[in-house]
Amino acid sequence: MTPPLLEIRNVTRRFGDFTAVDNVSLTINTGEFFTLLGPSGCGKTTLLRMLAGFDQPDSGEIRLNGQDLAGVEPEKRPVHTVFQSYALFPHMSVAQNIAFPLKMAGVAKSEIDARVEQALKDVRLADKGGRMPTQLSGGQRQRVAIARALVNRPRLLLLDEPLSALDAKLREEMQIELINLQKDVGITFVYVTHDQGEALALSHRIAVMNQGRVEQLDAPETIYSFPRSRFVADFIGQCNLLDATVEAVDGERVRIDLRGLGEVQALKSFDAQPGEACVLTLRPEKIRLAQSVTADSNEVHFRGRVAELLYLGDVTLYIVELENGERLETLLPNATPGRTKFFEVGDAVEAAWRFDAGHLVRA
């Protein structure tokens, strides 16, 4: 079994009375695109700074390829960091910016030229070496910053919210560029972001952080479909959170009391006990709307009324107010074959979902 490239063991970092990183342990594999995801103040950037050597843990250890990095200065680590601000030298050409760290390392000119040429090819800027940074688009400047970080052939590339300054369309284009680049160069990427969509699109695995701790570490599909906590369900994408109490457990099914709505069935997802408080997490796209629903033992359905709607192009977001006042968000595609009915505000509807469409978490 191949040992992990990076090991973070029980790392804690405090600033006075505030614990920014709280006993975090992670392993990151060679060639992995790994993302630290969380809201502002969750500890993700502090953890990244410790990986880079810009900060030191109060306790715990960080090992890269088996080497303890305690006391190893940033410039002596086989690690490079790409920042949101690009940090390019405006008086240097693109090629000169990329060559700069090699010159500082005393690399021979012939090798510098060859490695700069390859780095420009890697980021698809082979014809832009003579340009100045001001002559490039935001996405191109970001690629130059990445090329400069890669030219020294680090074992680990750290990216601190590198796309957050770009507009939405350019961000999407750069996400594809990053995925392809990481596959091509085979270097381990550790990516920090607060953007859930970015994390889901880019990553092999995601560590969702909250208040200095890792709430969940999983593949993107698992985190989205099977969140382990209310926080993760709420933070990742849109999600309906319905408070409930466990009434009974029957094999893989759980009977729960949705407060104010009555008893329904759900799929068992943890060691639930009767009387235990829980939350049914339900993604909007899992709910269907109809004027009436045929009774089905595998479905849950409630009457309600369309309170609000928001047209989003490919889908429409419906806010359905149920008879007890609870509101459900529902996403319906606008181009569904055979769909002729589009609901309007005030329409009476039934909201329905399969019993296994939701995911139970502890309250």
Swiss-Prot record:
Its EC number is 7.6.2.11. The keyword Transport applies. It is a peripheral membrane protein. Keywords: ATP-binding, Cell inner membrane, Cell membrane, Membrane, Nucleotide-binding, Translocase, Transport. Its main location: membrane. One of its GO terms (molecular function) is ATP binding. GO terms for cellular component: ATP-binding cassette (ABC) transporter complex. ATP binds at residues 38-45. Signal peptide: none annotated. The keyword Hydrolase does not apply. PANTHER family: SPERMIDINE/PUTRESCINE IMPORT ATP-BINDING PROTEIN POTA (PTHR42781), SPERMIDINE_PUTRESCINE IMPORT ATP-BINDING PROTEIN POTA (PTHR42781:SF4). This is Spermidine/putrescine import ATP-binding protein PotA. It comes from Pseudomonas aeruginosa (strain UCBPP-PA14). The lineage of its organism: Bacteria, Pseudomonadati, Pseudomonadota, Gammaproteobacteria, Pseudomonadales.
